[in-house]
Amino acid sequence: MNRSEPISLADVAGEEKVQVLRDRVQVALGRKEATLLLKNCRLVNVYSKEIYRTDIAVWGDRIVSITPGAVTEAREVIDCTDYYAMPGMIDPHMHVDTTMLWPNELARVLVPRGTTTVFVDMVNIAHNAGAEAVSELMKAFKGVPLRAYF
């Protein structure tokens, strides 16, 4: 490819990923059916400290719209009039080893209560059990519905 030729998003990301992005935009614009529509929920905006009524449209595994009324068609619609929605919480410093829980059990406790991400401090396990234990703990987080950064 000549450097003077324009590069498209498909050249960089691949056509399949570009199509996924196009589909998300179409759902957000109300031109394509969403997977899930949460109607009339109270959205907690953690930046502005506001709580307001809105609809949340999901396509696949992504939120594509939080604009009230923008998306009207969905495979599943849930009336969330009595519910709140908020971003997942992040624990910025956690010693997983001192919880005495393996990652799948830790996720079972944290995720339903809103924590979706943890930053894991490995100093104790590294000092007491060594590199192999650190590696095993990191592997144990694979496939667990709790995002972990080490």
Residue ranges of predicted features:
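Alpha-helix N-cap/helix-start motif
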Residues: 51, 99, 127-130
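Short, low-complexity, polar/charged sequence segments that are solvent-exposed and flexible
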Residues: 55-64, 96-97, 107-111, 138-139
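Divalent-metal coordination cores built from histidine and acidic residues
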Residues: 2-28, 106-150
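Histidine-rich, glycine-flanked metal-binding segment
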Residues: 13-37, 42-87
